[in-house]
Amino acid sequence: MDLGPGDAAGGGPLAPRPRRRRSLRRLFSRFLLALGSRSRPGDSPPRPQPGHCDGDGEGGFACAPGPVPAAPGSPGEERPPGPQPQLQLPAGDGARPPGAQGLKNHGNTCFMNAVVQCLSNTDLLAEFLALGRYRAAPGRAEVTEQLAALVRALWTREYTPQLSAEFKNAVSKYGSQFQGNSQHDALEFLLWLLDRVHEDLEGSSRGPVSEKLPPEATKTSENCLSPSAQLPLGQSFVQSHFQAQYRSSLTCPHCLKQSNTFDPFLCVSLPIPLRQTRFLSVTLVFPSKSQRFLRVGLAVPILSTVAALRKMVAEEGGVPADEVILVELYPSGFQRSFFDEEDLNTIAEGDNVYAFQVPPSPSQGTLSAHPLGLSASPRLAAREGQRFSLSLHSESKVLILFCNLVGSGQQASRFGPPFLIREDRAVSWAQLQQSILSKVRHLMKSEAPVQNLGSLFSIRVVGLSVACSYLSPKDSRPLCHWAVDRVLHLRRPGGPPHVKLAVEWDSSVKERLFGSLQEERAQDADSVWQQQQAHQQHSCTLDECFQFYTKEEQLAQDDAWKCPHCQVLQQGMVKLSLWTLPDILIIHLKRFCQVGERRNKLSTLVKFPLSGLNMAPHVAQRSTSPEAGLGPWPSWKQPDCLPTSYPLDFLYDLYAVCNHHGNLQGGHYTAYCRNSLDGQWYSYDDSTVEPLREDEVNTRGAYILFYQKRNSIPPWSASSSMRGSTSSSLSDHWLLRLGSHAGSTRGSLLSWSSAPCPSLPQVPDSPIFTNSLCNQEKGGLEPRRLVRGVKGRSISMKAPTTSRAKQGPFKTMPLRWSFGSKEKPPGASVELVEYLESRRRPRSTSQSIVSLLTGTAGEDEKSASPRSNVALPANSEDGGRAIERGPAGVPCPSAQPNHCLAPGNSDGPNTARKLKENAGQDIKLPRKFDLPLTVMPSVEHEKPARPEGQKAMNWKESFQMGSKSSPPSPYMGFSGNSKDSRRGTSELDRPLQGTLTLLRSVFRKKENRRNERAEVSPQVPPVSLVSGGLSPAMDGQAPGSPPALRIPEGLARGLGSRLERDVWSAPSSLRLPRKASRAPRGSALGMSQRTVPGEQASYGTFQRVKYHTLSLGRKKTLPESSF
């Protein structure tokens, strides 16, 4: 692996010649940048991608075809100082961000589209594939390459249906079960796809390391390493981020010895707790005419048969169970009858089930059965058997269920209620017709004639073919038809035998006799509403599913286990738990269950959290000490300065859901995914993409859940710098690297971000903890609460970014990369504190630093006062104005644009001569402390100047009366002992304050000798530093700038002894030209400061205070003697 820029001078074996050339070119390029020149794009060769292999494999993944060069600003890439070019991103359509792109359905491929959308919104996998970070031999990872091309096209908005078709062909080529256009399970395809990606990348990740790296190369930052270098030897990307381990423990109830078994998993399949009963409604048909129909609600057992339902209905009606007939009745007529041995799950919740009570049978004589006995001849016995069968048909009764239909066949529709009659099978057609009319007589019109009308309707036997199931009016005994015999012969145990008949009326006859008679209306009992409410509110939580999944169970007697310690068969206790947790946790809800011989889909609502899923209760307890952790976790997964008991490694956030709509026989798959750019949820239904509210994510169709662990961002990711960062999510997104490739013609993301976005959803609270461990390591600095922001969690859980046009002028600046390191401590700030505490003199400082107090650093700063403080923006509660005071409590009028008065020293003419010679020269600091300063442009010329006389009068009166007001300045100054100013100073100014502290120490030590010389010659009168004689820059002030104010000689002498020490303990007023507009790399809070035209600021004053070092983000009081 190539050495980083910082390791070019390290020892170790010599690199090959191509590497040496590249190192020399990079060194030369850095030298040009250090001189302030900017090389052309063609002068410097593109830096290879981290982990790029130059020949033999180094372990991890194999070389990908056509490696993608590292994007500017990526970890390990040197970034030149100065303004950075605006990064380009694929432009959205104005309404949806990149990544919110649908997929074409190529014929029952909804299962494939839903899984691809969920994986595309998996940030770690999407960045890994889209940026080509995998190392696969060409032609040996076709599925992975096609998936990477498809994911890349979704995020660059270059998707075409041809890409998804090629991906489907690749899947069909290597997975024969997915050939054709059949429906498939989304979970089956997901596991197959992850396994295929693992196989494509596994072979190349087991190669030996070709060369031994020098020790200096092993000390480089983790951000410079590729994903393959971060993975353990022999592990693929899927194993590292998707795979974890189960632990199955078997405990002997006698000796309490435990046997553990560990198994890997890619997905956790959670069973859904089932209710023991379910809701079912049944309509009872009573023989009385006052109340014929009553609909009741029942809680029937799930694992039961129709016999249990028949028993429950008999209890509701108060009749014996063997006198209840259960049938299914729809608007088209009778459908089927239910028998006792049938599974109760064959009756759905919405089926119309009718229960008929058998009418009491009239007293009738016993059938005279002629005993066969022994006969003289077989012929006589046969004739007697035929006579007995004829008497059975002619004299037996049969139960008839009939309903009235208008029309014929399958197009008929029912009117009126169903009826149950008992009729003799030997009756004629006319007798059967009169019996039916007597039952429906009360439904007819009063004036309708029913006598001598001939055949009014046709009768069809239900349950057989329509063509051969009609009874003939010409038959003398129509109930003796073969169709009736067949129905009675096919009956099974459960209720009395019966025949279902459909009485089909002609529409004209029906209108003449019944008018507009419709179906019956059944009255609902109170039990219907009660049972519906009890069963419709059934839901469970995801934690309950985990508890049900990991609960301890005892082995059955047939599955007894022989304990190796007791050597006896024992019914051990089995418990399944999670031993390790993956970065990407995939949870499968088992909605398809096997009940008997039938598989059903469970529509139970499983309530799962969108953020903050705590997996700590479901992880196996370690028997080791708490410091041992959870196993061999990589170092980048462990947060810095966290207590060992803080469960940050157990928190997960949801980012995708795969839904199933329909039943087991057929359905449709959709996906709900959260976009990592705007934080909004979107619904993906093949090619249709629509925004989704957060309260609509949790549905009864949720099938597969995708969770990502918080802070599980590897150092090779573009988002690795977002830990502890407060910049926007756009500046840290990996898509910036993809959009910054050479030759990219895609538009900027700002065109999409300027579109109006919906309101910000509620982001889960960030964990707040005390960094006590850091305080102990840093020398006992004052403890300060550290709040991990939104960047601390997964990038897909960031809050949606609002419109750029509505965020003010500060948000319209070009996007910048965050240089905050994930694991590297702020080295520059620590070195600065150590340097100040050591009281050492800076190197390479051969000239006097006092000249900078009276001169300016450039031509654009002539209007600045020699003793004015460096401009610092402050945001205070009272509108951004801070009260300033002069030296030793001398006030500065708030209405004055002049600078505060600074007493002079008594160095005499020699000092004045040196100040003139050294005016305008920059201070030379050691390279170690060459920190950038924030240069704020002066806007004094934009302010209308007031009359000079009025200025001098106000200042003189204020100085004599000791007013507490301070002169306003174009920039806000830093006040050491002002509470408002201290509260108003933002964290962005801390690197600058650290630089001022350094300059104060250098300035103080440099001028100590001059104070001694001044004490030897007290006859030299003190000279004001603001007098024009000492500062040649003051003579050439810009027009419109206020004149320098002079102090009377007596007043200066009176204040000299009292204010002499205050001058040297005050902050330096240097204004050095900065080389870069960015903060130090080591500081996590260092950010470039921008000034909006029209913003007011002021120059600070000198005060006697105890200054603090804020470069580390913490306040530490330093004694004045150190300055």
Curated annotation (Swiss-Prot):
GO terms for cellular component: nucleoplasm. Residues 1-102, 202-221, 795-826, 854-886, 959-1049, 1068-1099 are annotated as: Disordered. SUPFAM superfamilies: Cysteine proteinases. Residues 979-990 have a biased composition (Basic and acidic residues). Transmembrane segments: none annotated. It comes from the Eukaryota. Signal peptide: none annotated. Residues 101-710 form the USP domain. Its EC number is 3.4.19.12. The keyword Transcription does not apply. Belongs to the peptidase C19 family. May recognize and hydrolyze the peptide bond at the C-terminal Gly of ubiquitin. Involved in the processing of poly-ubiquitin precursors as well as that of ubiquitinated proteins. This is Ubiquitin carboxyl-terminal hydrolase 43. It comes from Homo sapiens.
